[in-house]
Amino acid sequence: MSGESDQPQPGPSHAGLYLEHRERDQAGVPGGVIRRAGSQRHRSWIQTVIEQITGSPRQCVTLSEVVPVSVLAVQRYLLEDEPRDTVPKPPLYCYDVTISDGVYQEKCYLDPSLNFLVYQNILKVGIEMRISRVSCLYNEKRLGQGILCIDKVHCGEPLDVISVETPFRNRAHEEKPERPLRGSKSHYLALWNNEDPYGDIWKTNKQPEEFNFNNTKIISLSHLEMTWHNRKNFPALLVRILHKSKLRYYGKPNKKMIEPYQTYLEVADSSGMVSVIMWNALCPEWYKSLRVGLILLLQDYSVKKSYPLRIQPDPVDPQMKLISTMEICLNLRDPPTNIVIIPEKQLKSEWKLPKLINRFITRSELDDMPENSICDVIGMLSFVGRVQRSKKKENSEDFWSYRWIHITDGTSEQPFIVQLFSTSQPEVFENIYPMTYFVCTQLKVVRNNSQVPKLLYLTTTNESRVLITGHRGQPYTYDTKAKKIIQWIKTKTNLEAKNTVIGGYYPYPPVPETFSKYSRFIKAESLLTTISEVRKVIEDLQYREQKRIAIQGIITAIKYIPYNHSAKSAPASETLQNASPPSTSQAAAKEGHYHERGSKRSQDDRPMDSLPMVLSLCAKRKILQGPTANPVPVPQPHSSAQMKGNKPNIPSRENSTANATGKSKRIINDRWESQLWRDKKFSLRDHLHYGHVDPESIPRKFILGHEKFLTQQFNSQPAKYVPPEGKPPKLDEFQSARSLGHFEVTILGLNHEIAIDVAFLPMYSPEDVETSQIDTFLTCMNYSCVYPPAAPVSGRVPDPKAVAGDIVKAAADLDRVHIIGILDICNLGNNKVEVCLQKIYTPE
């Protein structure tokens, strides 16, 4: 940096990287927009822009000087109480973007027409960005709150490091609690869902306190049930929390609620269990301080008739009475509820409060559990999948966040497979990784024994709670089953940590063995998608949203693509592996994304045919009947340590298909294309290319010591930038849990006008000779789970290329056969999409 420069110079090293100490100018108007940087060594670009636009509100200004800035925060909120007629069909949510020019930080309002940049995770924290058109907007409900609006922007690449020490130009942006730029009473939401508490409005400071009961009248729940209709004032309740639900956000535009939240507590005394509803601003005040097992004294509450459509969780104790005719309501006002946490040491035997009881089951017991049963599990995490999202309703802006995990408890070769939805515990949900003690309560059993492979997994409910730390002293540590499992976990070694996996594409739940069974669970109008509609499906997906569709076509070509890297016998931080060549979309991404207010997404910015692809897996024939293979990754087939002195003795069969007869086909080594494809491929109306496998799609072997980096890679993009600790490794430096490469499969539409390339990655373990016994392409795609067992298998180890040759031949046998392909599609963000062939059906 030159000390003679009046303005920060453009370039990748500029954005937010000024490290000199700068004193704030104290001459600004309190809460005002303009604060002049009189004594700054470097002139603030943000200051210059603000001075240029404040006199012309709502007028777009094209900037004569565009310099790179860094993005420090992207925050979402509902615009609750401002006119929404300025934009036709305005979006439900708005975004504030905090930028830094190296001198000042500024919180800016993103024009709603650019919201899709956040939906697609193109505009995200940590990147370099150039803003070329802006406007000024005043919040008339706040003094001096002029807002810098972003109307045209170019999103660049992530920066290695950004200084977070620069001050805000506008002191109002530093106020606590942090409030959005627009709306008088709005608050920030979690970036990717509405269930997680986010921001500094959520308190954690409520502690148990000694209470003098001398002048306090207490009523039992059963007595209250009989008399509440005739009462105006209610005596205090002394209860224990047995269940706590996740948060429900019910905010809507033009509803003037300060914090529109709701949560349920199931509480009990000696006479029964009842639902308690905590409303609105009381949730940020108390939610994070309340936990299952606490004793509460509730005063100044209200009582109402229970909501008829809500299903209460059953008491764990079958002798406990379930009170379902009334609900206890807690509010910050009308009346203002008084809540006291009573310390456990003050508990008196005459209160007869129920103890906290768990319903732990072992993995060996799960096979006999009926569908929809509720249970608790404890064990060790052996697989932690990436965070994904699904729409709550079609055409909705609201999403569920979830991830797939495997839990082992030593009672079975198979793990618990759990679909873990967000439980309003982001501090847990975002910090789980393999080899962690894991407790999850109130899980529901999902099963279908008539399906092949059998469907059996657990899913969270509204009352599920997760614990990964603070186990000591918890009531469940005295449970007989839990104690045995805890002892088993203590015997696990670091060596076994090598058999754990994190992240990547996870093809679960499996689809049924026939298309007729598959179609029973799909709405008729959305059962089949034309290949020409696939592009639109992909464009409509938001960040980490996954969708499963079915297409019809003909397999006309297949190509085997082995991994082009080798796993070295070194720590992940020292293991450098060559990544696959970037797709066209990745190359385009490096040039950045340019977008302006009111413009539609340009063709160059769509996640189109050049986007990368995801892996699809199959399983070994010997486990087709069950969904629960032990989640153990396999070593890299090309590892120098493995290959040296251990070359396979089985002759390669990759050329065994070269003399195939029958239909017209050409098979050369590791690829095949049909005569139909040679005739049609140059006259297609459209060809969608999704054959690339992105590094994020590949499950990685978990390595202790790198848990923070790996966890961050497979979590959702954060709302605020956190500087890295030292120089972080790269994801493709971590060894893949796959040993066989992937296949690029070309499917031609039935009308021979459009084709699509998709990725298919079969299950393969070089330790297991049975994986080479692939009879047909169809058999290979009848998988059960992601990872093969760890049990050693005697016999010769087949060459991966020999297995690939079998799969190529199996695909060739389907020449000109009309098939139905089940595709899993996921938006990975930043114009990267994975499309995976999960299953193929032939006409029944």
Swiss-Prot record:
<dbReference type="InterPro" id="IPR012340">
    <property type="entry name" value="NA-bd_OB-fold"/>
</dbReference>
<keyword id="KW-0238">DNA-binding</keyword>
<keyword id="KW-0158">Chromosome</keyword>
<dbReference type="Pfam" id="PF17659">
    <property type="entry name" value="RADX"/>
</dbReference>
<dbReference type="GO" id="GO:0005657">
    <property type="term" value="C:replication fork"/>
</dbReference>
<feature type="compositionally biased region" description="Polar residues">
    <location>
        <begin position="652"/>
        <end position="662"/>
    </location>
</feature>
<protein>
    <recommendedName>
        <fullName>RPA-related protein RADX</fullName>
    </recommendedName>
</protein>
<dbReference type="GO" id="GO:0003697">
    <property type="term" value="F:single-stranded DNA binding"/>
</dbReference>
<feature type="compositionally biased region" description="Polar residues">
    <location>
        <begin position="572"/>
        <end position="587"/>
    </location>
</feature>
<feature type="region of interest" description="Disordered">
    <location>
        <begin position="571"/>
        <end position="609"/>
    </location>
</feature>
<dbReference type="GO" id="GO:0006282">
    <property type="term" value="P:regulation of DNA repair"/>
</dbReference>
<feature type="region of interest" description="Disordered">
    <location>
        <begin position="626"/>
        <end position="664"/>
    </location>
</feature>
<dbReference type="GO" id="GO:2000042">
    <property type="term" value="P:negative regulation of double-strand break repair via homologous recombination"/>
</dbReference>
<dbReference type="InterPro" id="IPR040893">
    <property type="entry name" value="RADX"/>
</dbReference>
<feature type="compositionally biased region" description="Basic and acidic residues">
    <location>
        <begin position="590"/>
        <end position="608"/>
    </location>
</feature>
<feature type="DNA-binding region" description="OB">
    <location>
        <begin position="228"/>
        <end position="331"/>
    </location>
</feature>
<comment type="function">
    <text>Single-stranded DNA-binding protein recruited to replication forks to maintain genome stability. Prevents fork collapse by antagonizing the accumulation of RAD51 at forks to ensure the proper balance of fork remodeling and protection without interfering with the capacity of cells to complete homologous recombination of double-strand breaks.</text>
</comment>
